[in-house]
């Protein structure tokens, strides 16, 4: 998307009249966002920009006016901020501006007939100006608001519907009152709060326009996420050139909310707005109960219709919520003005959810009230719901610790839930002690024992301790014994199996269990498990190296209400941690210490082996790229120490392999230690292939450093074989580059260049950008002779072309088709065919013979069932292969 930074919009053709000066001032130092333009002639005739204050509605409108005038076409600008505007005033203003363009000439009307005073008469007059009906004219109406009378709004809508087709309208406001006719007629396109919010790219462009130099792009992207793109807030925070822990407490933001929103609405609605901020979401009945009133319906309707301050919760049309930053601002006002009622109101809100069976919200709000005593009488069903279906790990841990100790022994299910929480808090030893004690009890009458929740907790808990083989056996056994009578437990067990298969690169088995798990979890409303299914799918994408697919999975997870990304703090933090490696690979890592420290704190308390290693490896690699070798090794040593403390041997071995790789460049001899590492029992399990591949790569680098290039190439080939066996794309890319380095060191530049080209092509297809950059940097330091090979294939240009922090979204279906139909080399050939290269040019580019390219083309034609290059390109694009 092209973004134009505007300091002086090209309005030379417009003329230096008052309206031009007024409109030009509105866009000074703003950015032009083409995605908000109405330039498309096939678009509806009316464009409505509607959102709360500060979303750039007027700016978008002004840019449209200037764009229209710059093209030499007539444009009318009218601001309706004044509540005293009448239909006569509006009609007269439009006529006056149209007359300057000679669109209408009422002086030629016969004597005794005055200019139209009503909009419907003006519409008729415009139809009579047949000579001008081909000239596209834009009428911009700014500040459409609820203060305008409904008859006036209806007159405006009728005017828009009844004017000639060459007249188009752009409208900006904060109300939807009066627009029903336009919606019904299908004559209107809406740009809402979501559309008007800044994207990360737009915020970066704004920072450039404002010469903001102190905030890196990654931090700007994080800022946009935190304020959900609210343009006014982005501007205020960029000008400060530093983020704030509590954005609503920033003086400029506080003043803006107070002046433009809070003080701008009537008193009764201010009270409602402030009260609503105490609730996670608001419904009329809930509000009326909590605050003992009867005006919930009218207030919600007024604020959502006339100010756009309340928005629908996705998938829940009866629920409304506030923008999170605005909600924090309003909460501060509420607690400051009336602190004594805090606990009382929160308890009423918690009890409201409790009565409706919404225990997740009830527990969360009661924790904010610092009072959980009333919840001691929870039934077993409720506790199980919170533990297994909602996955409220943090809230449950806090709540359970506050319960009286006697309650623990009165209800065995409390101990089971606590064991569940301990497993997901990396305290497996304590959890197993609890389970052992409970297993020794022989009370067969307890419901918790009949449903075998204890055995399920043990089965899934083993996976959190990285005891995958034991966990898989116990989960399968539990499903066969109890799955038919316990859908919630079956969904949890199937989800655990999915995570195990993703961790062990068993992707064929993963596909089968995912389909079954999704069906069961949907039936059982297993929200916590849905989040973990996304984790399993994301792990598969990362393990395969398919970063475009991984990005798509994250996006889907964040918008899927079943995954509870917004409702569950635990699930949200889990995805933040997983996303770190993806962002590093795409070169858009948020390196703010605050963000990193939060993620590191989370994984130290809750991170299973795969998540823990993913985060530490990404942070270590990032530090190494900044020439911070000590910091790079430090976090890996921390991971290793954590692994020893928690008895996680796989994490210990992976961390040690990464440490050895960091030490290779320093000339430290470690080949003997690497050989002894192979004897570790972890290399005989299901995780052996990726572990062996990682170890072989480090061994190859060590041998190359010692100039034993033949053995180094052999180790690299073995690593490639291991990677291909499990479809680990990133490891294959690294293996090919290590092989090329060894070959270059041995003097075989032709083979080295061939493998470099192949590695780069795989990286392009996978979009694993940083892998290539990191590996090449390492190899060139260890094997100086390899620099010539990398230079010969113009690697800098190749990397520069695909290492930008923008990716092509690749759907899963396309990923699978590409893997199933064509080889990576064939896809590489097709890409070059699409660029117009001849067979000879492709052969030169890929460092192979022309006959080899012809052979690949015949295979491609046969696979895609086509007869020529053009058809092959079209069919491959249709199937999403290229």
UniProtKB/Swiss-Prot annotation:
Which residues are in the HTH luxR-type domain? 815-880
One of this protein's GO BP terms? regulation of DNA-templated transcription
In what pathway does it function? Hydrocarbon metabolism; alkane degradation
Q: Where does ATP bind?
A: 51-58
What's the domain of life for this entry? Bacteria
The GO terms describing molecular function are: ATP binding; DNA binding
Q: Give me the positions annotated for DNA binding.
A: 839-858
PROSITE patterns reported for this sequence = HTH_LUXR_2 (PS50043)
For this protein, the parts annotated as crossing the membrane are none
Q: Which UniProt keywords apply?
A: ATP-binding, DNA-binding, Nucleotide-binding, Plasmid, Transcription, Transcription regulation
List, alphabetically, the Pfam families matched: GerE
Q: What induces it?
A: Protein expression is autoregulated and sigma S-dependent in stationary phase.
Its biological purpose is as follows: This protein activates the expression of alkBFGHJKL operon in the presence of alkanes.
Its recorded name reads HTH-type transcriptional regulator AlkS
């Amino acid at each position: 998307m092209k973004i134009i930074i505007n300091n002086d919009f090209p309005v030379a053709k417009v003329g230096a009249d008052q309206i031009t000066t007024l409109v030009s001032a509105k866009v000074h130092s703003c950015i032009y966002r083409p995605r908000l333009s109405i330039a498309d002639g096939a678009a509806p005739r009316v464009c409505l920009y509607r959102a709360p204050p500060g979303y750039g509605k007027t700016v978008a409108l002004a840019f449209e006016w200037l764009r229209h005038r710059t093209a030499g076409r007539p444009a009318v600008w009218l601001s309706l901020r004044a509540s005293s505007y009448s239909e006569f005033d509006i009609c007269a203003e439009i006529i006056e501006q149209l007359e300057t363009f000679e669109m209408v000439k009422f002086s030629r009307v016969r004597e005794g007939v005055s200019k139209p005073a009503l909009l419907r008469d003006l519409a008729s007059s415009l139809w009579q100006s047949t000579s001008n009906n081909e000239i596209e004219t834009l009428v911009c109406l700014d500040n459409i608001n609820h203060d305008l009378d409904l008859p006036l709004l209806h007159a405006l809508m009728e005017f828009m519907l009844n004017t000639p087709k060459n007249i188009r309208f752009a409208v900006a406001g904060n109300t939807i009152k009066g627009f029903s006719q336009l919606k019904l007629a299908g004559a209107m396109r809406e740009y809402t709060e979501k559309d008007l919010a800044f994207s990360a790219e737009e915020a970066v462009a704004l920072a450039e326009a404002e010469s903001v130099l102190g905030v890196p792009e990654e931090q700007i992207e994080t800022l946009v996420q935190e304020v959900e793109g609210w343009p006014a807030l982005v501007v205020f925070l960029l000008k400060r050139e530093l983020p704030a822990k509590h954005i609503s407490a920033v003086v400029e933001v506080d003043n803006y909310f107070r002046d433009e929103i809070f003080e701008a609405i009537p008193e009764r609605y201010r009270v409602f707005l402030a009260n609503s901020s105490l609730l996670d979401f608001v419904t009329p009945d809930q509000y009326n109960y909590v605050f003992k009133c009867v005006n919930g319906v009218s207030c919600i309707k007024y604020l959502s219709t006339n100010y756009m301050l309340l928005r629908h919760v996705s998938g829940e049309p009866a629920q409304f919520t506030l923008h999170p930053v605005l909600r924090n601002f309003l909460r501060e006002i509420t607690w400051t003005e009336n602190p004594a009622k805090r606990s009382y109101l929160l308890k009423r809100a918690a009890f409201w959810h409790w009565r409706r069976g919404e225990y997740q919200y009830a527990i969360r709000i009661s924790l904010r009230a610092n009072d959980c005593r009333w919840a001691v009488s929870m039934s077993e069903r409720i506790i199980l719901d919170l533990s297994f279906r909602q996955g409220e790990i943090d809230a449950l841990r806090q709540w359970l610790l506050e319960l009286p100790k006697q309650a623990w022994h009165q209800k065995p299910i409390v101990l089971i839930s606590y064991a569940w929480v301990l497993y997901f808090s990396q305290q497996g030893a304590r959890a197993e002690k609890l389970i052992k004690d409970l297993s020794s009890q022989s009370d067969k009458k307890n419901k918790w024992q009949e449903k075998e929740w204890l055995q399920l907790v043990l089965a899934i808990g083993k996976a959190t301790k990285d005891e995958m083989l034991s966990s898989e056996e116990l989960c399968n056994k539990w499903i066969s014994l109890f799955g038919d009578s316990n859908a919630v437990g079956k969904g949890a067990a199937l989800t655990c199996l999915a995570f195990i298969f993703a961790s062990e690169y068993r992707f064929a088995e993963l596909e089968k269990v995912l389909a079954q798990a999704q069906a069961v979890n949907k039936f059982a409303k297993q929200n916590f498990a849905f989040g973990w299914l996304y984790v399993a799918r994301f792990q598969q994408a990362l393990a395969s190296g398919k970063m475009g697919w991984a990005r798509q999975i994250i996006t889907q997870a964040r918008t899927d209400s079943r995954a509870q990304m917004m409702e569950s703090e635990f699930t949200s933090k889990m995805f933040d941690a997983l996303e770190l490696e993806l962002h590093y690979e795409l070169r858009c890592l948020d390196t703010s210490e605050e963000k990193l420290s939060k993620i590191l704190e989370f994984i130290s308390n809750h991170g299973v082996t795969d998540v823990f290693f993913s985060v530490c490896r990404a942070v270590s690699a990032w530090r190494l790229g900044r020439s911070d070798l000590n910091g790079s090794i430090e976090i890996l040593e921390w991971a290793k120490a954590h692994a020893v403390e928690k008895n996680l041997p796989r994490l210990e071995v992976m961390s040690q392999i990464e440490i050895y790789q960091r030490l290779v460049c320093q000339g430290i001899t470690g080949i003997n230690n690497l050989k002894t590492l192979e004897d570790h029992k972890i290399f005989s399990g299901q995780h052996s292939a990726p572990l062996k591949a990682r170890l072989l790569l480090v061994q190859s680098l060590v041998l190359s450093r010692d100039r034993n290039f033949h053995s180094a190439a052999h180790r690299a080939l073995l690593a490639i074989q291991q990677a291909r066996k499990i479809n680990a794309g990133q490891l294959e890319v690294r293996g090919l580059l290590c092989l090329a380095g060894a070959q270059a060191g041995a003097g075989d530049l032709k083979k080295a260049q061939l493998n470099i080209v192949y590695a780069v092509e795989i990286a392009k297809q996978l979009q694993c950008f940083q892998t290539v950059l990191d590996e090449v940097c390492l190899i060139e330091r260890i094997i100086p002779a390899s620099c010539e090979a990398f230079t010969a294939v113009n690697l800098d240009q190749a990397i520069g072309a695909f290492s930008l922090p923008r990716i092509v979204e690749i759907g899963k279906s396309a990923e699978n088709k590409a893997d199933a139909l064509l080889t990576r080399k064939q896809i590489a050939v097709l890409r070059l065919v699409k660029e117009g290269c001849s067979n000879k040019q492709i052969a030169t580019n890929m460092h192979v013979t022309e006959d080899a390219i012809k052979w690949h083309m015949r295979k491609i034609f046969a696979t895609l069932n086509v007869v020529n290059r053009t058809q092959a390109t079209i069919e491959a694009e249709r199937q999403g292969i290229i």
